[in-house]
Curated annotation (Swiss-Prot):
It catalyses: C-terminal L-alpha-aminoacyl-L-glutamyl-L-glutamyl-L-tyrosyl-[tubulin] + H2O = C-terminal L-alpha-aminoacyl-L-glutamyl-L-glutamyl-[tubulin] + L-tyrosine. GO terms for biological process: angiogenesis; labyrinthine layer blood vessel development; negative regulation of angiogenesis; negative regulation of blood vessel endothelial cell migration; negative regulation of endothelial cell migration; negative regulation of endothelial cell proliferation; negative regulation of lymphangiogenesis; placenta blood vessel development. Keywords: Carboxypeptidase, Cell cycle, Cytoplasm, Growth arrest, Hydrolase, Protease, Secreted, Ubl conjugation. Residues 347-361 have a biased composition (Basic and acidic residues). The active site is at residues 179, 214, 231. This is Tubulinyl-Tyr carboxypeptidase 1. The gene is Vash1.
């Protein structure tokens, strides 16, 4: 239990929100068990059911997860009293034992100490697939958040640097998370893998009169696709980088949805995310929005491969995720940019005008020296 996070609501126990929230996640798992018995899946990105094009990152305070309301902690940590009480009221509504389970946990004076997972660290020689397994293992150890209250508010319009600060806070607090939080955390934990491309993949499915939303972090390493993520179901989260094409990866998720009687309606694919944690660019969450029913099977597959090809072209041309960071770093004259500059010059050496301008650079030095002498 991290220090300094203790909140004591009036008339409640002295258990801290962080420790009790983690305990509540385990207790609320019993409430989810009946749903799994009827093959009801409730994974979501946080958008309201029955409404298709609303802003997913903003929305209302009372959002819906496949028809079941859930809340977002917009006050940060430590959790304020109003959010704390609202969470417990919601737990009492969705748990089979109602208020009894809430009173039992909040009234306990000897809550077990929840172990805090260690953030994975890697040797330079550790293969990327092994690193991905370690990252996914860490995400899984945080556990899925069953409380009905998302602890970290994620605004998709925030610059990448702000989202990375939030991910760092997730590792510090070690609270249960949902799928969107897992994507941000996955980006943060893979920033040190420059040969790994990361991009968001969102799913919208339909089951029993309700829409469900889910998101994972797609990855591409060595031409093979995989994914990192968090879900109530094992086959809707981690996928090792073993799929030859993007369409194979997405269709594998569709098959997993089919096993729990969900119909895939839409897939949203984002562009590759920069590896610079200080980048001020925004994540492009939905570069391609694919309507599965309208496209048909063959066109759906073609559009997936078209998106994959577009990502490769942007990275190859240098217009992919690192571009805004490169332009920003050129003004700062960082050592890293100086090392990569010769590569850019070589790529431009075929252009005659730029080649003719190079000899003019030393001529500018005497003028600069003369200016210094005059001063």
């Amino acid at each position: 239990m991290p220090g300094g996070k203790k909140v004591v609501p009036s008339g409640s126990s002295s258990a801290s929100p962080n420790a009790a929230a983690t305990t509540t996640a385990a207790a609320a798992a019993a409430a989810a068990a009946p749903h799994s018995g009827t093959k009801r899946l409730e994974t979501t990105e946080g958008a309201s059911a029955q409404r298709d094009e609303e802003p997913e990152e903003e929305g209302e305070e009372d959002l819906r997860d496949g028809g079941v309301p859930f809340f977002i902690n917009r006050g940060g940590l430590p959790v304020d009293e109003a959010t704390w009480e609202r969470m417990w009221k919601h737990v009492a509504k969705i748990h089979p034992d109602g208020e009894k389970v809430a009173l039992r946990i909040r009234g306990a004076t000897d809550l077990p100490k929840i172990p805090i997972p260690s953030v994975p660290t890697f040797q330079p020689t550790t293969p990327v697939p092994e690193r991905l397994e370690a990252v996914q293992r860490y995400i899984r150890e945080l556990q899925y958040n069953h409380t009905g209250t998302q602890f970290f508010e994620i605004k998709k319009s925030r610059p990448l640097t702000g989202l990375m600060d939030l991910a760092k806070e997730m590792t510090k607090e070690a609270l249960p998370i949902k799928c969107l939080e897992a994507v941000i955390l996955g980006i943060y934990l893979t920033n040190s893998m420059p040969t790994l491309e990361r991009f968001p993949i969102s799913f919208k499915t339909y089951f029993s009169g309700n829409y469900f939303r889910h998101i994972v972090l797609g990855v591409n390493f060595g031409g093979r696709y995989g994914a990192l993520g968090m879900s109530r179901r094992e086959d809707l989260m981690y996928k090792p980088p073993a799929f030859r094409t993007l369409s194979e990866l997405v269709l594998d998720y569709e098959a997993a949805y089919g096993r729990c009687w969900h119909v895939l309606k839409k897939v949203k694919l984002g562009q590759c995310v920069s590896h610079d944690p200080h980048s001020v660019e925004q994540i492009e969450w939905k570069h391609s929005v694919l309507d599965v029913e309208r496209l048909g099977r063959e066109d759906f597959r073609k559009e997936l491969e078209r998106h994959a090809r577009d990502m490769r072209l942007k990275i190859g041309k240098g217009t992919g995720p690192p571009s805004p960071t490169k332009d920003r770093k050129k003004d700062v004259s960082s050592p890293q940019r100086a090392q990569s500059s010769p590569h850019r010059r070589n790529s431009r050496s075929e252009r005659r005008p730029s080649g003719e301008k190079k000899p003019a650079e030393p001529k500018a030095m005497p003028d600069l020296s003369g200016y210094q002498i005059r001063v």
